[in-house]
A protein has these predicted regions:
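N-terminal Rossmann NAD(P)H-binding glycine-rich loop of SDR-like oxidoreductase domains
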Residues: 4-26
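Conserved glycine-rich Rossmann-like NAD(P)H-binding loop of the short-chain dehydrogenase/reductase
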Residues: 28-40
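Conserved catalytic-core motifs of eukaryotic protein kinase domains, centered on the activation segment
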Residues: 44, 82-89, 129-134
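NAD(P)H-binding glycine-rich loop region in Rossmannoid oxidoreductase-like domains
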Residues: 54-93
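Conserved Rossmann-fold NAD(P)-dependent oxidoreductase catalytic core, especially the SDR/UDP-sugar
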Residues: 99-138
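SDR active-site strand-loop-helix element
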Residues: 9, 34, 72-78, 118-124
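Rossmann-fold cofactor-recognition segment
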Residues: 44-56
């Protein structure tokens, strides 16, 4: 039997860590976290952590087979400056990684017979500046 969990990707960032603690404080007992970085030791009590990459299709397949994922909080991303300097990597993580997680959610939904909640927080920065002139002002 697969274990029912809430999945949080990109958990090692500031927002991800706050989310894990808040969800745990609200009584979410079955948190599964995923990040390319290890979880800080003081947060390991809140979740079962997997150190891995959202681009790793075999890892995502393993998650589908081992866990009954009822919700996904997708926080993993390459942001701003790093994304500008590594646009191919940014596209892979931000677009292809997100698509992989959406496919995972669809598979889980099919197995469960009910929707998987997919939360994808972002900011206005996701849209970028409309043109180079606007960007140069900042």
């Amino acid at each position: 039997m697969r274990k029912k969990v809430t999945l949080i990707t990109g958990v090692s960032g500031e927002v991800g860590l706050a989310l894990v603690k808040n969800l745990a404080d609200l009584g979410y007992a079955n948190l599964l976290t995923l990040d390319i970085r290890p979880l800080p030791p003081e947060y390991t009590k809140y979740s079962n952590h997997i150190q891995g990459d959202i681009l790793d299709k075999s890892l995502l397949n393993r998650l589908v087979s081992e866990y009954d994922i009822d919700a996904i909080f997708h926080m993993a991303a390459l942001l701003s400056t790093r994304a500008e300097f590594t646009p191919v990597a940014a596209h892979q993580v931000n677009v292809e990684g997100t698509m992989g997680l959406l496919q995972l959610a669809a598979e889980q939904s099919e197995w469960r017979g009910e929707p998987v909640m997919f939360i994808f927080p972002s900011s206005i920065a996701a849209y970028g500046m409309p043109d180079l002139e606007s960007k140069s002002k900042f």
